[in-house]
Regions:
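Core motif of extracellular immunoglobulin-like domains
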Residues: 20, 29-31, 70
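N-terminal pre-Walker A segment at the start of P-loop NTPase domains
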Residues: 88-118
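Short beta-strand segments of immunoglobulin-like
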Residues: 4-10, 43
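Structural beta-strand segments of beta-rich domains
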Residues: 6, 14-18, 122
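Switch- and interface-adjacent substructures of P-loop NTPase systems
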Residues: 116-118, 141-277, 285-305, 318, ...
Length: 365
């Protein structure tokens, strides 16, 4: 059985086109989800010479999603073929993009002051598998606030191995190179092998503020109390105030609960939870995940694929849906984009509020 030109995934308002050609005379019956379809209205059925069978459903709607089957029969045999038709988008947004609020959110973050005088900068720790764009998130956020493309942190998605080898804090600066009260710590990627990538013990030490800048990750041994880069008396300012898990929107469908990378992320989340540290997810590469979003980021919260990726992430890692934020990093762009900035700023705003709540509670204890 043939399918629509773009496969079985179509946009709302498109025409569903399915066809079949038989090499002998047969009778045909079209069904959708086991219910017989009849010619009329938006449904057009054509049987030509008892050999060519076609079905068109115009102005596709949510109700047209389903499994379409053509049953063919003659005196000698009975066969059938099926095609699943899926609409790429919902009728309405399932979360607001709030593009008009982007400038206001940016100004609020630029003027932000930490609510605890013991802490000059809120500290965010990025964790996630190799190649998800952790370093690119830091570059993208700095690009937004500086008004130009910034490559503060090295990135390399081609090797399949972590490009980050040392623990380092990266400041966020505005257009005048003034540091904003946010610092991002990047770590070695979590590889999908038990003995590769950053060690859980090192990440937990980082959460506790026990890892100094410059510490080089070692997949075979964790930081010890005798190490030069071990902080034996971390202050609240040294500790992580929000854990940011970074997930590739398309690759999340390739993971299972048993995968080492997923297990590592869950262990780190549990450690953060035990410490009272809040956590969020930044879901990257949304343009690779859905053709609608690749065409226009305005479709981000109409996309069924993006919502499915977020739900899959929630199921695997355990983060609530309202703490998962789809974002797009700058990659090949040379100029800023309002929709890209809207997504990353709203994600950062949520992370900042969560981190500030954490340090405020600590000040009252």
């Amino acid at each position: 059985m043939g399918t629509t030109p773009s496969g079985t995934h179509i946009r709302k308002g498109d025409t569903v086109r399915l066809s079949w050609r038989s090499n002998c005379g047969v009778y045909g019956t079209w069904k959708k989800d086991e219910k017989v379809l009849a010619h009329g209205g938006r449904v057009s059925i054509s049987h030509k010479d008892f050999k060519h069978f076609s079905l068109e459903v115009k102005d596709a709607r949510q109700e047209d999603e389903g499994n379409y089957t053509l049953e063919l029969s003659n005196r000698k045999a009975r066969v059938s073929g099926s095609a699943a038709v899926t609409l790429l988008e919902f009728d309405t947004e399932w979360r607001g993009l709030f593009l008009a609020e982007t400038d206001e959110v940016k100004k609020t973050l630029e003027a932000f002051k930490v609510s605890n005088s013991e802490v000059r900068c809120l500290r965010f720790l990025l964790q996630g598998p190799v190649g998800v764009g952790k370093s690119s998130i830091i570059n993208t956020i700095n690009s937004v606030f500086q008004g130009q493309m910034v490559n503060l942190t090295p990135t390399d998605a081609a090797t399949g191995k972590s490009h980050t080898i040392a623990y380092q804090a990266y400041p966020i600066e505005d257009a005048q190179k003034k540091s904003l009260p946010f610092v991002f710590n990047d770590i070695m990627g979590l590889e999908n092998e038990k003995e590769s990538g950053a060690l859980i013990a090192d990440i937990i030490s980082a959460l506790k503020g026990r890892v100094k800048d410059g510490y080089k990750f070692n997949a075979s041994s964790a930081l010890t109390e005798t190490d030069f880069h071990y902080n034996s008396a971390p202050s609240l300012a040294d500790k992580v105030h929000c854990l940011v898990t970074v997930i590739h929107a398309n690759n999340i469908f390739l993971f299972t609960e048993e995968d080492d990378a997923i297990q590592k992320m869950k262990q780190v989340r549990k450690a953060a939870r035990d410490l009272g540290v809040p956590d969020v997810v930044f879901m990257t590469h949304v343009d690779h995940c859905c053709p609608l979003v690749k065409k226009d980021l305005n479709n981000i919260y109409l996309s069924k694929r993006i919502k499915a990726a977020m739900q899959r992430c929630s199921d695997l890692v355990g983060v609530p849906m309202n703490c998962i934020f789809p974002v797009k990093n700058y990659h090949q762009e040379t100029k800023g984009d309002a929709k890209t900035e809207c997504l990353i700023l709203h994600a950062l705003d949520k992370a900042v509020k969560s981190a500030d709540d954490f340090v405020r509670v600590k000040s009252s204890n």
